[in-house]
Amino acid sequence: MDNQDRGSARTSRRQFISVAGLAATAVITLATSSTAGAAGPTAPNPGSRVGDPAEAQAVQRVAETLLNSGVPGLAFAIVKPDEKNRKASVTTTYHYGQADVENGVRVTPRTQFEIASETKTFTAALLAKLISRGEVGLDDLASKYSDGNPLPKGIGGEEITLRQLVTHRSGLSDDPPNLSAGCADPTRSCTDEKAKYTRNMLWKGLQDAGALEFAPGSHWLYSDFGFGLLGTLMADKIIPGQEKPPFAAAVAREITDPLGMMGTVIETKATDLAVPYHLDGTRAPLWNNTGAIAGGGGLVSTAEDMSIWAATTLGYGNNPLKPVLTSMLEQIDTQAPENPAFGMGMAWQLQPPTPNFPQRFAKKNGDSSGSNCITLLVPDSGWSITILANGGNAAMIDPAAVNLMHDLVPRQPIFGSSTGSSSGSDVGFQTGSFG
């Protein structure tokens, strides 16, 4: 990866996060006239599970806009209540465009996309599951699980807790200061620098003078470094004694296998991966965050799998993991002292109601050098929207999802109110057992 690839991913992600209220305070309208319609209606690829005409048309409008803006391939997953049984869910999926432009491979239900930072919700799930078993505590010091390796402290001796890691309040920088340590020239970034980043490099990076940007708990700063550390700590707790951090194995054993999410794996194990592309149409390098900070962004997934993830997090079904995933939507911290309206669950950012969309919702997005994704959850109505793309950027994909949310999700809660009462799937945004 070159500096441009790393910088573009970071910038687009940070822009969306730094204006967290934008999507909730104004209806975002996509440019669906002239350019989007120039090629005529775009039908979803074979294998799509299409919803009612109104939904299908709304998705088609968004898909055409993105495809005509240079995104090669897309997958959508929408979860909503079953009209005949509001305690059950219905999933629709839509696949468009190409997973591999040069070889003419279309996006199908099997197509895997890099989900980058949406991986953080799976990392948080490892923590939530260990908490549910009484094996760790949310306010435990992270150093309790670092096998004797010291972690940085604030100038007043403040130590990092698991709560702070899972809510971006640890003070750790976005990327490790020594992220390029595995490159031939450690002073310059390189392709696969994340894959080459070992556990020993992680411990050394944590001792770097630039590792901690502020005292733990005092501010909010999005941190791949922090979630990478959390992923390694929790994976080592679950599967101890491994030479390499067992993040992928821990996620498979504890999370994805029990949910039947067979297409959600660490990137090196992907068999149907969509090729990521730059905005100019050239191939982008694989994100390949498969080393010691994989918990920050190392997984790939499919639209079908992400619908399972969203539905279970909303509280649908009877999988034993349901209470673990729904607990992650409980507010356990504010995003930042200067912006208390925007709360943090475990990895999920919690958005307040606004006049334009009078329901709270949770969001998590992800972007790599050439892939983008986002999932929005509206628990009090039992809806979710996921978009996966092998091109574009967060400034394109995130508003597209918000646009669909405004178009499709009822303005008023279906299950109770949007001020803290639980949804039909027993989920709310009130502070719960972790608060």
Would you name each region that the model predicts?
Residues 29-46:
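C-terminal region of N-terminal signal peptides and the immediate post-cleavage residues
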